[in-house]
Amino acid sequence: MFNLNEISKIDPEVAKAIELEVNRQRNKIELIASENFVSKAVIEAMGTPLTNKYAEGYPGKRYYGGCEFVDIIENLAIERAKKIFGAEHANVQPHSGAQANMAVFFAVLNPGDTILGMNLSHGGHLSHGSPVNMSGKYYNVISYGVRKEDCRIDYDEVRKLAKEHRPKLIVAGASAYPRIIDFKAFRDIADEVGAYLMVDIAHIAGLVAAGLHPNPVPYAHFVTTTTHKTLRGPRGGLILCGNEHAKMIDKAVFPGIQGGPLMHVIAAKAVSFAEVLTDEFKQYQQQIVKNAKTLANALMEKGIDLVSGGTDNHLMLVDLRNKGLTGKYVQHILDEVCITVNKNGIPFDPESPFVTSGIRIGTPAVTARGMKEEDMVEIADLINLTITDYENSKEKVKERVRMLCEKYPLYQ
C-alpha cells in the first residue's frame, strides 16, 4: 500500500525504518491498549499538501490569508465532533491529548490552584497531576485512587478529598482503568465544592461515541480526548464544552498554548470523524468490548489475575504477582514471540514504574484487523503459554502468531 519511492530517493535510511515499522505492525499481535490501526483514508489525509498551510486563528478569523479551503476542512471536523458527542462546542486544534488537558488548565486555573485528579499509579494519566509532569509542577495536586479490596474508584474518598481541599478543578478519566466511570457522581461532587469538572475520555472515546460507555458531555464542564486510540483517528487532541465556555477554551488553545494548527492532521480528524458516524464504526466498537470481555475471561480461566476481576471496556490490567513475574520481563518475552503489550503499574504496586507488577492489554488494534472472540481465546492461550513455559513454547507460539496475522492481513 505504501509507496516510499520519493522518500527512498532522498532518505533511504528513513524509508527503510518506515518499512520495518509497517512490517512490525503487520506481523505482530498489537495489544497495547492505546494503539490502533487507522484507515487508509486517514493516512492519505495526513500525507497531503495541507501540511504546507499556516492557519493561526479559527475558521473565518485567521491571521493569514489563503485559508478559505482549510476553513472548510476545520469546520467539517468541528461539526462532526459536536454531532458525535452531542456537544455545543468543539475545538479540534490540540496537537495531543496532553495539550488538550493543558489548554483546559490554562483556561480555568492559575499557577498554584488546586486540582483533584486520579493517581497515576492507580490508573490515572501523567497529565492529570503527576509530579513529573507540567500539571504536577504548576498546580497543587491532590490525588484520589481506587479501593484496595476491589480496585474500583472510591467515590467516597473523592468526595472527602474534595470537601477537604476545595479544588478549583476535578479531573476524571484514566489511562489504565478497566471499569465504567460514573460521571454524574463526579459532577455531583464538583457542584458540592464549586469546582469545574474536566473528563478525559482519551481511552474510551470510541466507546462513548458508540453508546457503549456513558457520555460525560451532559455532566462535565470540559471533555478532552485524543483522536487516536479507540476513536481510530490520527494522533491528536480534541476539547468539547458548552457554549458558555467556548471562548475561554478557544483562547486557551490559541494563542494560549499553541500557535499554528496542523491542518493535515485536522483533515485526517475530519475524515476519521466521518468514519465514526457510520454504522460500521458502532459495530467495530461493539466487537472491541466483546473481544475484551472474552480475552479477560479466557485469561482468568487460565489462572491469570486481572485487576478488579475483569473489564467493562477495551482494556484489562494483568496482575502478575501470583506468577512471580514482573511487567518488564513479561513485556519482553511477549515481544520475543511477536505479541506487543506494555508493562504497567497496578494499584498499590510494590514494584517501581520501570519494573511494575503488571501489563496492560487492549483489544482496539486486533479488532481493527478483524479478529473476533475465538481469536481472543487463541491469544489468551498464547499469552499463558509464554508466561508459564516460555523456553519450551516460544517457537510454537511465534508460529501461531504468524498464522493469526496472516489470517487477518493489515495494510495490503
Swiss-Prot record:
Its cofactor is pyridoxal 5'-phosphate. Keywords: Amino-acid biosynthesis, Cytoplasm, One-carbon metabolism, Pyridoxal phosphate, Transferase. GO terms for cellular component: cytosol. CDD domains: SHMT. Signal peptide: none annotated. Pfam families: SHMT. It catalyses: (6R)-5,10-methylene-5,6,7,8-tetrahydrofolate + glycine + H2O = (6S)-5,6,7,8-tetrahydrofolate + L-serine. Its EC number is 2.1.2.1. One of its GO terms (molecular function) is glycine hydroxymethyltransferase activity. The modification N6-(pyridoxal phosphate)lysine is found at K229. Pathway: One-carbon metabolism; tetrahydrofolate interconversion; Amino-acid biosynthesis; glycine biosynthesis; glycine from L-serine: step 1/1. (6S)-5,6,7,8-tetrahydrofolate binds at L120, G124, H125, L126, S352, P353, F354. It is an enzyme of class 2 (transferase). It comes from the Bacteria. The record marks H228 as: Plays an important role in substrate specificity. GO terms for biological process: glycine biosynthetic process from serine; tetrahydrofolate interconversion. Belongs to the SHMT family. NCBIfam families: PRK00011.1 (NF000586). Catalyzes the reversible interconversion of serine and glycine with tetrahydrofolate (THF) serving as the one-carbon carrier. This reaction serves as the major source of one-carbon groups required for the biosynthesis of purines, thymidylate, methionine, and other important biomolecules. Also exhibits THF-independent aldolase activity toward beta-hydroxyamino acids, producing glycine and aldehydes, via a retro-aldol mechanism. This is Serine hydroxymethyltransferase. The gene is glyA.
